[in-house]
Structure formats: structure tokens, C-alpha cells
Amino acid sequence: MAKKVANIVKLQIPAGKATPAPPVGPALGQAGINIMGFTKDFNARTADQAGLLIPVVITVYEDRSFDFVTKTPPAAVLLKKAAGVQKGSGEPNTKKVATVTKAQVQEIAETKMQDLNAADVEAAMRMVEGTARSMGFTVEG
């Protein structure tokens, strides 16, 4: 018989840097998860993606066991990395802070494809371009 789901916890944690300290520890503690077990598993699974923010969905079962699924980093994080900037524009309609190429947008769209609700890479590219525009980035090409 399948285990009964008690809770679902969604977090965004830097890859390879999950620690029992806030904000990760308290969120997991409230759900009744073995914090050290989760942090070791998460850090091992995301060690190759250092420097990126990784969304994770943790499913907690009634017997306090858990499993988790890591997602691809948010498009905004990938765009900032591609453009080499710390943050987007405060006024995206008037102040453009960076430029990304179509090739960079396509690469990000292909990376994000498994998590996006898009039929093909073209649709995913349009989503990523929209995110770029809302951050004050110019898309060239």
C-alpha cells in the first residue's frame, strides 16, 4: 500500500549549501523531517550545480520518511548568470541593465524545458524572453 502524504514543503536552496541553520532547518523541523539526512542527500545531489539556487519539493509521509525532487534553477537566476549581473532593473521599462543573446535564451530554455509548461523549445524561449524583459534585459538577435 502506498504511504500517506503528510506534508509537502517547497524551498529554494543554494546548490550544495543546505545546512540545518535557518531558513532550511526550521522549515524541515516543523514538517518532522530528519534535517541532517535531508541536507546530506541534497548537498550530494546538487554538488555539481554550485552557485545556483535550486528549487526543491520535499514530500513528507506520515511515518516521517521523505523524498525530494530537485527542479531546474529559476529562469531569472540563469539569466542573471548569463548576463553577468547581480540583479535586474528596478525600472525594467525605462532602465535596461543588461543584454542577452538569442543563443543564451535558447540555452536557458533548453535547460528549463523539463520544468516549463511549454510544447516546444520556441515556446520556452518566449517564456524566458518575457522573464528577461521583465528584469530589464534586452534580448538581441
From Swiss-Prot:
Keyword rRNA-binding listed: yes
Post-translational modification: One or more lysine residues are methylated.
One MF term in the entry's GO annotations: large ribosomal subunit rRNA binding
Keyword annotations from UniProtKB, A to Z: Methylation, Ribonucleoprotein, Ribosomal protein, RNA-binding, rRNA-binding
GO BP: translation
SUPFAM superfamilies attached to this UniProt entry: Ribosomal L11/L12e N-terminal domain, Ribosomal protein L11, C-terminal domain
InterPro entries found in the cross-reference section: Ribosomal_uL11, Ribosomal_uL11_bac-typ, Ribosomal_uL11_C, Ribosomal_uL11_C_sf, Ribosomal_uL11_CS, Ribosomal_uL11_N, Ribosomal_uL11_N_sf
Signal peptide positions on this chain: none
GO cellular component terms listed in the entry, alphabetical order: cytosolic large ribosomal subunit
Keyword Disulfide bond: no
PROSITE patterns named in the record: RIBOSOMAL_L11
Function: Forms part of the ribosomal stalk which helps the ribosome interact with GTP-bound translation factors.
Complexes and interactors: Part of the ribosomal stalk of the 50S ribosomal subunit. Interacts with L10 and the large rRNA to form the base of the stalk. L10 forms an elongated spine to which L12 dimers bind in a sequential fashion forming a multimeric L10(L12)X complex.
Family from the record: Belongs to the universal ribosomal protein uL11 family.
NCBIfam families: L11_bact
Protein name: Large ribosomal subunit protein uL11
Record lineage: Bacteria, Bacillati, Bacillota, Bacilli, Lactobacillales
